[in-house]
Amino acid sequence: MEAVTLSEARVYVGTYNKYNSGSLFGKWLDLSDYSDKDEFMEACRELHKDDQDPEFMFQDYENIPEALISESWLSEKFFELRDAIEKLSETEQEAFFVWCDHHNSDISEEDADDLISSFEDEYQGEYKDEEDYAYEIVEECYDLPKFAKTYFDYSAFARDLFITDYWMDNGFVFRCA
């Protein structure tokens, strides 16, 4: 999945009426300017107040996962999720969406705080490879003498860790739930 930064989400808002009449008139709206979906929809209505009953068309968007938007729909959960992940670093936000993809989490339906909590329980960090993570586990959890560490098979240990207890994607390591 391409890196997504919800705080920088934007939507190009037009209407089906204008589009079907040959006009692509619309405007990019930054979702960071709105606290919730109602406020965003009010801005859409104001933008297209010349349409009697505008049917909004989200013709393009940036920094919004496809699970949260389509041409004619923006999830109610977008604003909740955007606000919930603000406490995560940029790297953690990227890892969060990798984790969501792996778990097939329906971010348009699930509670944002529950998703973040589950993610934080499983996320271990970013590593260059599985062996790099195994090396850290040995350093933190095992009191091996320096002599023994030179003979330790980190590759085999990493293989064993990632067979059952951990998984890695795009450099992000997660504990299996």
Q: Could you tell me what each predicted segment is?
A:
Residues V4-S7, E131-A177:
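Acidic, proline/glycine-rich low-complexity IDRs
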Residues A9-G14, G26-D30, E55-Q59, D165-C176:
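Ordered hydrophobic segments in well-structured contexts
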Residues E39-A43, E80, A95, D111-D114, ...:
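Exposed alpha-helical structural elements
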Residues E2-V4, A9-R10, I64-E66, S70-W73, ...:
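Non-transmembrane, interaction-prone alpha-helical and coil segments associated with secretion
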Residues E2-D50:
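N-terminal ordered "arm"
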